[in-house]
Amino acid sequence: LEEIRALGREVDDPKVPMIFNKQSTSACGPFDEIHDPKVSNKLDYEGELAFIIGKKCRHVPREEAKNVILGYCVSNDVSVRDWQMRVPTFTIGKSFDTHCPFGPSIVTSDEISDPHNLDIKTEVNGEVRQDSNTKNLIFDCFQLVEHLSTSFTLEPGDLILTGTPGGVGIADNNFLKKGDNVKISISELG
């Protein structure tokens, strides 16, 4: 909720997740350079837990959701904030090329003790900006699978990001600058 409030939006306890797509060209490796958007100086980071769907599925109840998740990885939901806020949906501001680094590895579901109790930390140039735990997610991974699979078929390889803790740059106008080093770590994942 902290991140949503930092965007200047009033929220109560959300009843359904806010969902948006990212273009496939936003995906890149964890050590690839994040391209400067050139049309904005409001480039922001969002350290997030991501998970990968392992089985084609539809209408998956929460209790069975863990059975369709192949594994988990670290991700950065890079956002161009002014473009994100121009329209009601976030897709355009979150889909610039290279704005979804993830990896470097996928840790299979059976190797994770509890995906909803992992420490997550984001550092920019060595300064800790986000420090939280996935137990603070508004919607957990299994709720997201249930919600999304109610609307459409999930395919093997689909990458789903779970949301970010407080501490994003927009909260205090501390945006990324060219050459900044962003490091995101999640316990049990790297």
Which functions belong to the PLM regions below?
Residues 101, 166-190:
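Charged, cofactor-coupling segments
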